[in-house]
A protein has these predicted regions:
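Acetyl-CoA-dependent GNAT
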Residues: 33, 44-116, 124-128, 191-192
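Conserved GNAT acetyl-CoA-binding A-motif
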Residues: 134-146
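A short beta-loop-alpha structural element at the N-terminal edge
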Residues: 27-41
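Conserved catalytic-core motifs of GNAT/GCN5-like acyltransferases
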Residues: 143-146, 158-180
């Protein structure tokens, strides 16, 4: 019994010597006008990555688009320890891409992750946030799309609970960013639970 007590005391003493673990503080909030340059930096990084992977890549988005999204509270950021780790935009209607879908849904666009925070499952965290946001608005689905048949991205979205609904080339692209003219659009949907 004395051995067991000494062993427990030794293990407790060792546990006390562990270095403190710093937990990251994570916050999701609306982007602000002061974030515009950082948003465009992240878009450029994401576009360069898409080019490197020979994927359909984003054009340079008009600054007015981002400013309007910020002013409409539809541009979001995930902060980790005060640094922008991920950005995205939302809308409640996406008829140009999704057609005449009548179910109330949250549409997510242009997810861009700060390379310093890659590999931390941030998309999954933002989808968890989207689920709670959608519930608070009585929405039925979270919907996303991507241009080009990116099998890795399709698999990733399926892994985090999205149903891949298929792909098709859009017939009408007026009013959409240029990359929608360059490939098939892949559609993803997840029920809000």
């Amino acid at each position: 019994m004395k051995y067991a007590t000494n062993l427990i005391q030794t293990r407790c003493a060792q546990a006390k010597k562990l270095k403190p673990i710093k937990l990251q503080e994570m916050i999701i909030e609306n982007s602000e006008l002061t974030d515009v340059s950082k948003i465009f930096d992240l878009y450029r990084i994401a576009t360069d990555y898409m080019k490197l992977k020979n994927q359909v890549y984003w054009p340079e988005f008009p600054k007015e688009l981002i400013i309007n999204e910020i002013e409409d509270n539809r541009q979001w950021k995930l902060l980790i320890d005060g640094k922008i780790a991920c950005i995205w935009a939302t809308t409640m209607n996406d008829e140009l891409i999704w057609g005449n879908k009548s179910e109330p849904s949250l549409y997510i666009h242009r997810i861009a992750t700060n390379p310093e925070f890659r590999g931390q499952n941030l998309v999954e965290k933002l989808i968890n946030w989207a689920n709670e946001f959608g519930k608070s608005k009585n929405l039925k689905y979270i919907r996303m799309d991507t241009v080009g048949l990116n099998k890795g991205l399709i698999g990733h979205y399926e892994k985090i609970g999205f149903e891949f609904l298929g792909a098709k080339r859009l017939e009408k692209t007026d009013g959409l960013p240029e990359h929608y003219k360059n490939g098939e659009v892949c559609y993803f949907q997840k029920s809000i639970i």
